[in-house]
UniProtKB/Swiss-Prot annotation:
This is GTPase Era. Residues 205-282 form the KH type-2 domain. It comes from Geotalea uraniireducens (strain Rf4) (Geobacter uraniireducens). GO terms for biological process: ribosomal small subunit assembly. Belongs to the TRAFAC class TrmE-Era-EngA-EngB-Septin-like GTPase superfamily. Era GTPase family.
Amino acid sequence: MTEKQFRSGFVSIIGRPNVGKSTLLNRILGDKIVITSDKPQTTRNRIQGIHNLPGCQMVFIDTPGIHRAKSKLNKYMVDVALSSIKEVDVILFLVEADAKPANQEGMILELLANADAPVLLVINKIDLVAKEALLERIAAYAALYPFREIVPVSALSGDGVERLVEVVHGFIPAGPPYFPDDILTDLPERFIVAEMIREKIFRLTHDEVPYSVAVVVESFKERADGLVSIAAAINVERESQKGIVIGKKGEMLKRIGMQARREIEELLDTKVFLELFVRVSKEWSENTRMLKEFGYE
C-alpha cells in the first residue's frame, strides 16, 4: 500500500457533560486511557486516543463536556472542548438516547453551525430505551441539524461501536500516520497516573469535593529492583475538604491509594509504591498561576 492510499485523521468527540464520551473512547480503543465516573465534568483535558486499522489511523479526541462555565477551571475546560472542533477531520456529537434534546444540545448545535468538518450524530445509551423511543430521538435530532450520519451505540456494552468506527473511516482523508502504530495515546505516564488517582477521588467522594481536587505527580522513579516509586499531591481548596479526602484515621486516603495503585500497576506492568499526601491550595480553581502549575493551561 502506498503512502497516498493510507488514511489518517483527527476525530473530535463532543457533547454535554456525562453523556459517555470517555467511555466511548475507551470502548473504541479496547483499553482504558481515559478516566470515567458517573459524575459530570470528570474529563478536564484534551485526551487523544490512537486507533489503528489496516491502512488507516484515527486519532480520537475526548473533550470536557460543554457547559456554562463559572470558575476559571470550568472556562478552561469549555475552551478545550471548543478548540477541538477546529482543525479536525470528523466531529462526533454524542447525545443520550434516554433524553430529549435540551438547551445544552441546542447551544452545541449552534456552535457546530459553521464547522468545516462533517458532523456525525452518535446516540449513546441505546440499551436504556425501546426501539420506538430511539426512532423518535433520531427524528427529533435529524430535524435540528443536517448530520452527515446518525449512528446509535451503547458505549457501555459496545453495541454499534464497530459500525461507528466503520462510518468514521469513510470520512478520514488520505495521509500518512501521525503516530507509531504501537501506541494508544500520546499522553505521558505521569498524566495518566495523576488521572487514575483523581478518578478514585471522583468515585469515592461526593458533593463539591471531587470538583475541588487537582492531582499532581511530584515524583516518578524506577528503582533498581524494577519497582516504580510514585509520590503524588492531592490539592484541595479548603481544610474541610482535606479532612474528607483523608477520612477518619486516614481510611479514605488508604482506599484511594489502594484502588489507584492496582490500576497503575496494571498500566505500568510492574509493582508500584504509591505515596499520597493532601494539601490545601486555597481557591486554586480561580488562580491562573496554580491552574497552569496543575496542568490546566
